[in-house]
């Protein structure tokens, strides 16, 4: 999934090894950079049903639901545009490169995706691809945290590329303390979230960047244009969302970046989440529930 992971377990230390193996399994199934992954098979399927692992069935269901529930403000079909813009190679392993057919489309609804749970197959609409992106990170954190708790961990905190899921007893009076860093100065803490059992995800225009003809590019694309969001005084550069699950915190952090404060915070409030938006010019805006979790 093109990110690093940090895992904290309160309980049997051997569960750290379990978490590592499980995250590696999800990486092998979900990465767009690994040619043998389920995602790569789906992205080359051309409308044919593909047998995938049940983990991938779960992932695809979330991707389809996220696109629908956010009115396509979160759009996992933008991979062809992202690759064309120069983000084909993995940032964590430069030997891994996304390979796509040049005739693929983006920005189309996934509603026609066929998911056969009984036979564990997925059929994507012809011409569309999937990029698990941030949703995959959040879902992986949720799944592994839940599984470690079922295996006896008293408390778990899993962080994958800025998506964090905390479950069970934390080290600070039973809670988990999560700092939110400034997008401008990494050592500066904007807020500290206190979570008993929940998730926090941060999405930023600076999380993944690269150069094309000496022009800086980033990975957060407009679902309308397929191009990186433009930096301006009114543009949000970083969005942090707190909720029950990392998967949805990540989805709606992306929504805030893409849609802006008016539409983004409307969706945040409707979903019962909390958010902090930081603008390019340094201004900050909190949603109504933000102070309930932070100091």
Located regions from the model:
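Mature catalytic core of soluble alpha/beta enzymes
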Residues: 1-295
